[in-house]
Amino acid sequence: MGQGRIYVLEDEVAVRTVLVEALGSAGHDVREFGDGQLALDEIDRAVPDLILLDMRMPRMDGFKFLNLLRRKPAAKALPVIIVSGLGDELLRAIDARAAEELGVVGIFAKPFDIPTLLRYVGSVIARDTRSGTRPPNP
């Protein structure tokens, strides 16, 4: 699995901790944020290779975050994987075309399988460094 800089946006500390530890153990450089605005501010300084995004966060939901993210020239093509407890509700709200426009490359419903998520993260990061083709949805 390739190494990459990953930003994890998740307001639930327990879930964020699991993600950060799993990604870090897989060799990724991980930054964690409980607030979307803090992540947007950090992206102005250092653009990651990938973002894992919870859609339901206080102060700024995932849709607002994605819209603000895409206004940043350096982050227009930045891949995002949604990790959300909204599950089927979210899948109904975000169709494939909307996902493509927002740069969403995958959606994982909570509770998610860590090994599957890690494999998918690795494929997204490897794809970015190799061919620019999108991996199949998980």
Predicted regions and their residues:
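His-Asp phosphorelay/catalytic-motif detector in bacterial-type signaling
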Residues: V47-D49, A74-I81
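Acidic, metal-coordinating helix/loop segments flanking the phosphotransfer/catalytic sites
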Residues: E32-L50
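Conserved acidic carboxylate
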Residues: E10
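Receiver (REC) domain active-site loop signature in two-component systems and cognate sites
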Residues: M57
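C-terminal output helix
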Residues: A109-V121
